[in-house]
UniProtKB/Swiss-Prot annotation:
Residues 1-16 are annotated as: Beta. It comes from the Eukaryota. A divalent metal cation 2 binds at C2, C13. Gene3D superfamilies: Metallothionein Isoform II. InterPro entries: Metalthion_dom_sf (IPR017854), Metalthion_dom_sf_vert (IPR023587), Metalthion_vert (IPR000006). GO terms for cellular component: cytoplasm; nucleus. Class I metallothioneins contain 2 metal-binding domains: four divalent ions are chelated within cluster A of the alpha domain and are coordinated via cysteinyl thiolate bridges to 11 cysteine ligands. Cluster B, the corresponding region within the beta domain, can ligate three divalent ions to 9 cysteines. Keywords: Metal-binding, Metal-thiolate cluster, Zinc. This is Metallothionein. A divalent metal cation 1 binds at C8, C11. A divalent metal cation 5 binds at C21, C23, C24, C37.
Amino acid sequence: SCAGSCKCKNCRCRSCRKSCCSCCPAGCNNCAKGCVCKEPASSKCSCCH
């Protein structure tokens, strides 16, 4: 469970596309490109790699 590990911000993440940020809280699906991971890249947030 990645709850709380990601949050939506201005879409700056070039590696995030479409709904790759499935670990983000509800409401972030439409802002997947702006998914910013607070956890290390080694976390379960695949969209943050």
